[in-house]
Amino acid sequence: MGKSLLAAYGLWALGGPLGLYHIYLGRDSHALLWMLTLGGFGMGWMWDFWKIPIHVYKYNRQERKNIEVKEGEPPASPIRFIGQVATGIYFGIVAAIGLSFLSSFHMVVLPLAVALGVHLVATVGEQTSDLKNTLIAAFLTSPIFYGRAVSMIPISLTASITSQKHMRYRLQQEKQEKLSLRLYRIGLVYLAFTGPLAYSALLNTSLTVSYVAGSIGSMLEWLSIFPSISALVERLLLLPYRVWAVFSGGGVFRDHYFKEWEKIYEFVATFQSEKEEMACKVLGVNFKSTMEEINRKYRELVKIWHPDHNRHRLEEAQEHFLEIQAAYETLMRLRKSKTL
């Protein structure tokens, strides 16, 4: 029986982040990915708005048995690669929250979780990859970064690159199974993913919060070499807390359990405060300085330390000039984010 485009859009609107429309269209891998990442971190769900007509067309064409199996190597997809890296890191963080107490965590659990996240993205749609090679890449990379809080980043990058090299079209189209069996299978995987996470978050809250805060700190420090990406990550991390603040009238978590998790958002806010303090020190201003004062001080320092005005000490001038530029951009970005 053919699928309705209107019904697909209805499910996209009602249960998009949970992948209901992908279940409706028989795309179980895609649905599972959306369930575990809340719609591909929200961005994938929004992107699917333009992709739904194509998915419906492909399903109905397959129903009419008028579909041919593609051969050869699929073209490289930057979007799929980015999704693999992000999902691999996400799976690694979830594993760290729920299973870091295991003695074999860094050597077995972490690379396994990251590789499975990478492979899940690889199996979306009519393509797939070689799970064996993806696992090998993850397990070979893991010992190099043993015990480091950001180890899931290089593991995910290596596994994603390996997965991309072994991408291929499926040899045959998946057979349509009963909905109950498909939901049962998806449910088991979902419980296996969320079970350890829920256990750790509820029964070992303080330790979990401490680990997450440490991992976030290491990640933000590593990303600080890319100011734009670092700022975007900080905003995304603070977004849930700010949304809560709007609906709760102040953002105060009254329950003890939620107060523990509030520490993570306080940690990110503190990280931003430290960056603002360092930027103020470079420009010779303070937290209470107005935008006009900051702009005036910036122009003065740029004029003093511009390399064209300091040919006799060019290297020192270039170093100070770049430092002033970075401090000014940081202050502008943080001040703008506070006004939003």
Swiss-Prot record:
Domain J: 278-340
Subcellular localization, as worded in the UniProt entry: Membrane
InterPro entries on file: DnaJ_domain (IPR001623), J_dom_sf (IPR036869), TM2 (IPR007829)
Main location class: membrane
SMART domains to which the protein is assigned, alphabetical: DnaJ
Membrane topology: Multi-pass membrane protein
A single cellular component GO annotation: membrane
Taxonomy, superkingdom: Eukaryota
Residue ranges of domain TM2 in the record: 1-50
Keywords for this protein: Chaperone, Membrane, Transmembrane, Transmembrane helix
Transmembrane annotation, as ranges: 5-25, 30-50, 81-101, 105-125, 135-155, 186-206, 212-232
Role this protein plays: May function as a co-chaperone.
Protein name: DnaJ homolog subfamily C member 22
Species of the source: Xenopus tropicalis (Western clawed frog)
Gene coding for it: dnajc22
